[in-house]
C-alpha cells in the first residue's frame, strides 16, 4: 500500500498530463487541454502501469470569425468619389492595383467590351491599353483615405473557407461568419475587348503572382463549385471587381 500513486494520461499525439492520488484521496482530477489537432486517444497509466482504459477526444471545432472587416459591397465610383456599391450590386472593374475603374453593361453573358471611359475618380476617355496599373491600391482611395485596402489571398481563402451560406444561381452567393455577411456576384474578368467567365465570381487579391500576374479569387456559378484562389495568378492588365477590407 503506497501513501500516494502517480496517474498519467498519455495522448496518442505525444501529450502527457499527470496528477497524484493517495489512500485518503484516491480520486485524481487531471485537466486535459482542448484538442486543436485531429482526434486523439487518451490512455490512463497508474503507477507506471497501463490500465488499458482509453478515452477518445475529438478535434475542437473553432468557429470561423473573419480577421478583418469586409466592405459591404464592391468598390465603385459615384459622384466623383470612390465608394462601395450595395451588397448585391456589381462594382466597377479595375486592372490590378489601378486607381481607374470602369463599368460594364448588362447582360454580362454577352461579354461586353470596355466602353472607353474610366473613372479615376473623374471620368476620362482612355484606351484600354493606356490604363495604368500596378501602383495604387484603389481601396485606399475610399474616404477616409488609407482606411481600406485590397484583401490578401489568405483573407480571400478565409472569407470563402466555409463555402456559401446562400446561393442563387446567376444572382449571388453569401459568405458569412455569423457577424458579417459578404455577398459575391457574377462578374467575370475583362480583357478590354471581351469578358471571360462572365457568370463566375472573381475578384483581385493584393498579392502578386507569377511574373506580371496577380492572385485572385474565382468561384464558378454552380451550387457545388468550390472557391479557388490562384497561386500563379492572371495578367495584371486584365480587370476584375475589387472588394475591400480594413482592420477590426
Each language-model region and where it sits:
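C-terminal, surface-exposed recognition/capping segments
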Residues: 62, 68, 72-79, 86-92, ...
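Short beta-strand segments and strand-loop junctions that repeat across beta-rich extracellular domains
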Residues: 8-12, 57, 138-139, 143
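Edge beta-strands of extracellular beta-sandwich domains
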Residues: 49-60
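Surface-exposed binding patches on compact interaction domains or structured appendages
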Residues: 1-29
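Beta-strand-rich extracellular modules
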Residues: 33, 45-49, 247
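Extracellular interaction modules
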Residues: 22-25, 47-48, 234-240
Amino acid at each position: 500500500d503506497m501513501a500516494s500513486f502517480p496517474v498519467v494520461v498519455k495522448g496518442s499525439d505525444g501529450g502527457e498530463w499527470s496528477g497524484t492520488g493517495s489512500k485518503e484521496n484516491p480520486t485524481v482530477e487531471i485537466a486535459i487541454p482542448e484538442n486543436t489537432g485531429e482526434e486523439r486517444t487518451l490512455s490512463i497509466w497508474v503507477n507506471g502501469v497501463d490500465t488499458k482504459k482509453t478515452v477518445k477526444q475529438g478535434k475542437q471545432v473553432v468557429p470561423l470569425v473573419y480577421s478583418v472587416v469586409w466592405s459591404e459591397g464592391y468598390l465603385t465610383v459615384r459622384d466623383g468619389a470612390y465608394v462601395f456599391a450595395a451588397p448585391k450590386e456589381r462594382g466597377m472593374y479595375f486592372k490590378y492595383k489601378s486607381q481607374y475603374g470602369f463599368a460594364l453593361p448588362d447582360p454580362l453573358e454577352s461579354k461586353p467590351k470596355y466602353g472607353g471611359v474610366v473613372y479615376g475618380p473623374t471620368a476620362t476617355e482612355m484606351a484600354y491599353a493606356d490604363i495604368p496599373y500596378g501602383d495604387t491600391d484603389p481601396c485606399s482611395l475610399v474616404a477616409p483615405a488609407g482606411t481600406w485596402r485590397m484583401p490578401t489571398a489568405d483573407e480571400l481563402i478565409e472569407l470563402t473557407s466555409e463555402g456559401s451560406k446562400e446561393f442563387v444561381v446567376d444572382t449571388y452567393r453569401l459568405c458569412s461568419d455569423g457577424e458579417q455577411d459578404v455577398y459575391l456576384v457574377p462578374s467575370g474578368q475583362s480583357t478590354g475587348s471581351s469578358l471571360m467567365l462572365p457568370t463566375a465570381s472573381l475578384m483581385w487579391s493584393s498579392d502578386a503572382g507569377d511574373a506580371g500576374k496577380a492572385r485572385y479569387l474565382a468561384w464558378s456559378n454552380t451550387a457545388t463549385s468550390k472557391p479557388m484562389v490562384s497561386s500563379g495568378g492572371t495578367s495584371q492588365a486584365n480587370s476584375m471587381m475589387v472588394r475591400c477590407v480594413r482592420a477590426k
